[in-house]
Regions:
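Flexible phosphate-sensing "switch/lid" loops adjacent to ATP/NTP-binding sites
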Residues: 3, 15, 23-28, 37-186, ...
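Pre-Walker A adenine-sensing motif
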Residues: 9-18
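Conserved glycine(s) of the Walker
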Residues: 33-34
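Phosphate/pyrophosphate-binding betaalpha-module
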Residues: 192
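Short conserved motifs of the RecA-like P-loop NTPase core
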Residues: 199
Length: 341
């Protein structure tokens, strides 16, 4: 304020940019609800309908912003060219591996106009529980019953829940049924016109049998654990489901900023958040993993950490996708908007 700046909480009518193409927005009520697998499911549906899709990702303003005005990612090499952090890679890499082009940056009108040149449909891939930057034809919002009640307790996540055309209650296969019911009741109370889809996100591990009886270090998506307030993620579920003998406490092995992360977020005890906001922090994450006394590392992050870190022990990746019934339900909603063409 001393410099004369004004600060306001802006509404969607003031901030959303209109596209010349149909827009499907995927947002959430909290970090770590499952936007990423929902976005991947939506792009898969659109491609099966013969549509060209451009995914536009919510900004993550790290580094020199003057070099990030309008970014286009079509290959894994593009992630290196733009010096992407682990957090950025976690959002971009799964899209790229699925054959999707991702746009990001800081000038979101310019980004939209570039994306429109390549696409029949724009996918807004939300982040930070923020509202869509683009005016959507279909607003899909993901909620998490592992954090029941958060859908009406956090801003701007609750704003998304109130604006949604479709609310996808994710992770119902691992959540308490009463918590699923609580989320559904809250959504019906604040947004009675929203269509509700109950979804599961089953986890899978290649060579899962090798987990049984092992002492396992679990590495999870960082933001989900930290400002998302989760105590565990897909890696922890995979370890439990596949008979790990021990889930190793990572805290005694943490160094530098990773150690400070555990101090700042004391609810995180059994899993290691994959923090990587720069080269130094990536190195500290690598050192923490390599120092851990374990037989196996289970990586529950959306990216292949093995491409970025030199891990000195066996490691397995955990993946997760939406289940087919929820994908079918999403397809019905998308066809309703796009006319099934």
């Amino acid at each position: 304020n001393a410099a004369g700046a004004d600060f306001r909480i802006m509404g969607h009518k003031s901030t959303m940019i209109a596209s010349t193409k149909p827009v499907i927005a995927v947002c959430a009520v909290r970090t770590g609800c499952g936007k990423s697998q929902t976005s991947r499911a939506v792009t898969g549906i659109l491609k099966s309908m013969g549509k060209r899709v451009a995914a536009v990702r919510h900004p993550m303003p790290y580094g020199d912003l003057t070099k990030q005005i309008c970014q286009r990612f079509a290959s894994l090499e593009d992630l290196d060219v733009h010096h992407c952090t682990i957090e950025e890679r976690e959002e971009y890499e799964p899209h790229i591996r699925a054959g999707n082009v991702v746009f990001a940056g800081i000038d979101y009108e310019r980004i939209l106009r570039e994306a429109e040149k390549e696409a029949d449909v724009i996918l807004w891939d939300g982040g930070n529980n923020d509202m869509s930057f683009y005016r959507p034809n279909l607003y899909i919002v993901v909620a998490d019953p592992h954090r029941a009640g958060h859908e009406v307790r956090y801003y701007p996540g609750e704003t998304n829940a109130r604006m949604a055309d479709v609310v996808l209650i994710n992770k119902t296969g691992t959540a308490n049924p009463e918590d699923v019911k609580t989320v559904e009741q809250n959504i019906k109370r604040i947004n009675p016109n929203a269509r509700i889809i109950r979804a599961k996100s089953p986890v899978s591990v290649e060579n899962a049998a090798s987990i049984k009886g092992k002492r396992v270090l679990v590495v999870e998506d960082g933001p989900t654990l930290t400002h998302g307030d989760m105590k565990f993620g897909a890696g922890h579920i995979a370890a439990k489901n596949n008979g790990a003998a021990v889930i190793v406490d990572p805290r005694p092995y943490a160094v530098g900023s990773i150690k400070k992360t555990f101090e700042k977020y004391p609810h995180v005890t059994e899993v290691l958040p994959a923090m990587g906001y720069g080269k130094k922090q990536m190195k500290e994450l690598e050192q923490t993993i390599n120092a851990a006394d374990c037989d196996l590392v289970l990586i529950g992050t959306p990216i292949d950490l093995g491409r970025l870190l030199k891990i000195n022990k066996p490691a397995l990746r955990v993946t997760y996708e939406l289940d087919q019934p929820s994908i079918n339900a999403l397809k019905t909603e998308i066809e309703r908007v796009l006319g099934g063409a």
